[in-house]
Amino acid sequence: MSESVHTNTSICSKGMLSVIVAQFLSAFGDNALLFATLALLKAQFYPDWSQPVLQMVFVGAYILFAPFVGQIADSFAKGRVMMFANGLKLAGAASICLGVNPFVGYTLVGIGAAAYSPAKYGILGELTTGNKLVKANGLMEASTIAAILLGSVAGGVLADWHVIAALVACTLAYAGAVVANLFIPKLVAARPGQSWQLAAMIRSFFCACVVLWRNGETRFSLVGTGLFWGAGVTLRFLVVLWVPVALGITDNATPTYLNAMVAVGIVVGAGAAAKLVTLETVSRCMPAGILIGVVVAMFSLQHALLPAYALLLLIGILGGFFVVPLNALLQERGKKSVGAGNAIAVQNLGENSTMLLMLGLYSLAVMVGVPAVATGIGFGVLFALAIAALWIWQRRQA
């Protein structure tokens, strides 16, 4: 997009729709690849505790590259950054198809994802602003969750048929995302001319961390989104091990169907948040966050498929309503202080550090033999208490 682009354009503009299509294909590949690679690990007789470790190497890339990816997103046209990042994902998926160690290939996908995230969210603030940004985030989350829904199911179903076919489908999805990125109009770089010295980049990133942490609103958003996504990723792996224990089902498809219900719910919750929550009323989302933990504990006690589907759908609705306003708040406030790209990179550091911690604790619980049901109950209760503490803290800071 040229310099004539102005913010606050329609969320159905050509630029916005191009971003959404590219995001859908990229997220589809991410989620199909996760379940296809988990099936590959199962087929190659890796131990159960290696499953969360697979995700840990992915989020480790986010943490390692966090000081750099925000500046990259703000120093170049964000659509082109997205295209380069999807190219890295394409290379990672293709390498797994060709027999490279799945942990190595998945790490490469993680590097691409780390570079992609600040650009995909930062570009929204360059295409629109204000309360339209909440709606744009809702559209982005809806697209992402639709991709999670379809990608997760496709990955599991195809893997039950043929693991390599599932991996090839992931590679093709990333290739489609690269092509879609070509149709994103070129925006002017948000912050060109920054230093590319390693020490200066690290110093600049941690200065951005300090600026965002000292602001009460952005600190609140960082903690809330970190807890949510850390819990969300852990729940995905918990479901994979919970299904054979609680339901007696051992295929690859059933966990993907159950995880897909969370995705459907997030679409609904994101839509509700776009209509009911503004940047001035973000605290309305907090009760939903507490209820997520309560419902996770209830879900862990189920032994029938139908109530499990219903409760995971409810978890998704609560999750979408909780996280979309927090994302929009950080983007709007962060854009004005440290730049949208840096704000999202700081957010990614927080989210992925939380994911790494939660996945590490979950992997440890699996290694020492804690039952899946007990793990789920404890996980849900702790999450509810954490969000309640965050809400109390935020009210005292106000």
From Swiss-Prot:
Membrane topology: Multi-pass membrane protein
One Pfam family hit: MFS_1
Location, primary (coarse class): membrane
Disulfide-bonded cysteines: none
Transmembrane segments: 19-39, 53-73, 96-116, 139-159, 164-184, 195-213, 227-247, 257-277, 281-301, 304-324, 352-372, 373-393
Record-linked InterPro entries: LysoPLipid__transptr_LplT (IPR023727), MFS (IPR011701), MFS_trans_sf (IPR036259)
GO CC aspect terms: plasma membrane
Keywords: Cell inner membrane, Cell membrane, Lipid transport, Membrane, Transmembrane, Transmembrane helix, Transport
UniProt GO molecular function: lysophospholipid:sodium symporter activity
Subcellular location: Cell inner membrane
Family: Belongs to the major facilitator superfamily. LplT (TC 2.A.1.42) family.
PANTHER family: MACROLIDE-EFFLUX PROTEIN, MAJOR FACILITATOR SUPERFAMILY (MFS) PROFILE DOMAIN-CONTAINING PROTEIN
Role noted for this protein: Catalyzes the facilitated diffusion of 2-acyl-glycero-3-phosphoethanolamine (2-acyl-GPE) into the cell.
Record protein name field: Lysophospholipid transporter LplT
Classification of source organism: Bacteria, Pseudomonadati, Pseudomonadota, Gammaproteobacteria, Enterobacterales
